Amino acid sequence: MKNDENSVNLSRRDFFKELGMIGGGGVLLSAFPWLQSCSADDKVQIAKEKVRIGFIGTGSRGQYHLNNLKTIPYADVVALCDNYPPHLKEASALYPKAKTYDDYRKLLDDRNIQAVMIATPLYEHAHITIDALHAGKHVFCEKSMAMTCADCLDMYNVFKESGKVMFIGQQRLYDPKYIKAMEMIHAGLLGEINSIRAYWFRNNDWRRPVPSPDLERKINWRLYKEYSCGLVTELATHQLQVGNWALRMLPEKVAGMGDIVYWKDGREVYDSINLIYHYPNGVKMTYESMIANKFYGLEEEIMGSKGTMEPEKGKYYFEDVEPAPGIMQLINQIEHKIFDNVSFAGPSWVPETASVNKGHPISGQSSVGAAGDGSIELVTAFCEAAITGKPAPNLVEEAYYSSVLGLLGLQAIDEGRVITFPDEYKIPYLNFA
């Protein structure tokens, strides 16, 4: 493959065409069943209809989705709900014709609404989702699913019984770059996967401006254990899903540590965590996140016997780099001290320094939290599914396990012990089927 990113970057539509996902294709359905194409009849139905959406939770992530919905021709936002007036006012400016509510239950009573999208704080996800499904609505809920494993399981069970569509906001499942990366991994490009290292580093305090002290916990809910699980649910769940996706199996146990290392400002959730997930085949996924240094950013480093994949950077690297021709190879070997030095009285060795090869680009583009990370593709797929009434196979299962694994990681940190995946929270999927 030519090492030129501009030559391989594809438009999202061209990318999905390449994978056979548009126009009745199904090349990757066995590996990525949530990407199944619409039938010809489905496409006719989608072209003729609009799904009427009630949107619950109009803060920053909510408004991001609301802006994206404007670009989807078969999405019609007819109602908005938030119990924080400034956010509701901002959302109303985007959709001035939409009804407004300060109580989500009143929105659910509106029979004109076919589907709801939920972008509230984490502690509200479970009960709003369950109430919406009971009200006969299709549901899109932001990740993570819930604050407890029991609530995640309740959401899953109600969804399965409802006959409705449910999507969870795991956008990497629709990110063309990640899809292409997984196609390459599952085809054996990297050889046998033997380790995964994932991390997400930021440098900010997670605080939002508070107009009044009595609103501190409402606005800065991410910092308090009553409302938030911190880094494991806000960040880690994205990357845990990627690890499971790459290995096509689920870890059996987890150990971890966490502390408030830097932001000693009265917060209750950790600002630094380290986790180790152990898979049945012996592979470990290590995860680290902190919010006091952003130098390394975020990545999932998927390491195999033949190479390494970095899907967030859009690169993969082979272990054995093709040698440079002639004199350039000799110069490189001398400069990098490839030849062993034999000392007079001591061992002969060469340090295992990191590889300096530039790697090869993966097709597609991504930018976390912005257009191009799979978010708009995910919401588009939800709108299509809400019109046809056909759920995306295995999407909720992927989201369920990433949510529960994050919560088990937090339990391992809090209790200071290795946590084995509890049987009562296993649902039939992958190696837990």
Task: Set out the residue ranges of the language-model regions.
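Stable alpha-helical structural segments in soluble proteins, enriched in small hydrophobic residues
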Residues: 88, 370, 374-378, 405-416
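Conserved SAM-binding strand-loop segment of SAM-dependent methyltransferases
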Residues: 99-103
